[in-house]
Amino acid sequence: MNKKNIMFLGTASSVGKSTLVAALCRVLKNEEFKVAPFKAMNISLNSYVTKDGAEMGRAQVVQAEACKLEPNALMNPILLKPSGGHTQVIVNGKVYDNIEPYKYKELNKKLKGIVKESYDKLSNKYELIVLEGSGGCAEINLKDSDIANMNMAESVDAPVILVADIDRGGVFASIVGTLELLSKNERSRVKGVIINKFRGEKQHFEAGVKQLEEIIKIPVLGVMPYEYFDIEDEDAVTEKICNKESEDENSIDVAIIRLSHMSNFTDFNVLSRINGVNVRYVESTKYLKNPDVIIIPGTKNTIEDLRILKESKLADEIIKLHDSGTLVLGICGGYQMLGKILLDQQGVEGNTLQEEGLGLLDIKTRFNERKITKQVEAQVVSNLKDINEIENKSLVGYEIHNGISKVGKNVKPFIKDSKGKIIGVCDIEGSVAGTYLHGIFDSEEFTNAFINALKKNNNFDLLEDDELNKISDYKNEQYEKLAKIFSENVDVDKIKEIIGI
């Protein structure tokens, strides 16, 4: 079979392109096509580390999982991670440069060939590629340097499906306006439209769809309902990241500090799915209250977020709660914040050369330009205070950080990797702990023991033995649900005809 492809472009950002690409990927995979996703450029702080230590955007990880594939950085050759006044540029999984935002156009011209090369390598492995654009596809001020939208479609000769979001309003104008801003050749590449996030009865919308088709002379291939799919989000601007109070008094209260540059918030997806666990994201002292555990997550700008914590008085409140017995846990940047001091003599994060930490752990962190990105197998080597059954539990996760932390005398190892290297410590009493390991709660035995210890401390009912096994199956069930709803509401046969399969 000849290599085939199709590309989903959007009328704007956040119209649902990533989700619809994942949906089509699972539909085609279920029909036994060798399909893979591709997005030239992603802008996100929520990244993933592949088995070979390459960094890529989460959206393509989700799409790879929908294809039942191991994620590969070829699927997302360029990842931009904004941080303060500059952006870290990841190319083919490795740090390429740090640039000011006004240099994007110049950067894109340099990377155009790399993007095409990555696509070609991926295309040689699979019979069908489903591409995703970035943001809106008709940004005329960016058109000359575009490498992620219509220019990408043209370079690989991909037919285009235009995606629009009706929930934000003005869907007809956004579709017509987008097409109007495309050139004649670009517009001829658009073979269909999908209207996403529809609420209400479709029969009341049919007349509008017919009128739209008469105006644009392009078929509307489907109207996707506004439906909740519990799959990982690319960006932190999501309904999941909120301070949601539990209605169940018998639930464990997990307060995650919502940092301004919070990254890898997918670390906590499993926790949010466990019955009897309430996960809240807190950004002010008003809402911190008295949780069972406080977690300081990862961040793209540790020092700046630490300063914001201090200015907001959240830092003082975290220390106060710790002193009164609340367990505090830090992950990656949050781990660094728990230490005595953070040193940035090379200006990796910005212009602040050093900043005092919260002082809860006897560690000192020094930032350097070399970025550590690797998947890790590890083991918990110490229990924590009132968390007595996590020692010797196995962990699988990943590291992604610039800082190196020197361990002092007043802490003990909490987590070691398979080579015996310390990648997390706790204080002698076990009342505060931190680690560089992302994804620790994805390890079922550890999470089961951790949550049950908290439940036991509160005299709550413990988790069922198969509770977390159900969670493991849950993700695949969500992909199947997505594929089913896509197939029921979108003309998949027409899409296959457009692709040529």
Swiss-Prot record:
Pathway: Cofactor biosynthesis; adenosylcobalamin biosynthesis. The active site is at C332, H438. It holds the Pfam family CbiA. InterPro entries: Class_I_gatase-like, CobQ/CobB/MinD/ParA_Nub-bd_dom, CobQ_GATase1, CobQ_N, CobQ_synth, GATase_3, P-loop_NTPase. One of its GO terms (molecular function) is ABC-type vitamin B12 transporter activity. Keywords: Cobalamin biosynthesis, Glutamine amidotransferase. GO terms for biological process: cobalamin biosynthetic process. SUPFAM superfamilies: Class I glutamine amidotransferase-like, P-loop containing nucleoside triphosphate hydrolases. Residues 251-446 form the GATase cobBQ-type domain. NCBIfam families: cobQ, PRK00784.1. Belongs to the CobB/CobQ family. CobQ subfamily. Catalyzes amidations at positions B, D, E, and G on adenosylcobyrinic A,C-diamide. NH(2) groups are provided by glutamine, and one molecule of ATP is hydrogenolyzed for each amidation. PANTHER family: COBYRIC ACID SYNTHASE, DETHIOBIOTIN SYNTHETASE. This is Cobyric acid synthase. The gene is cobQ.
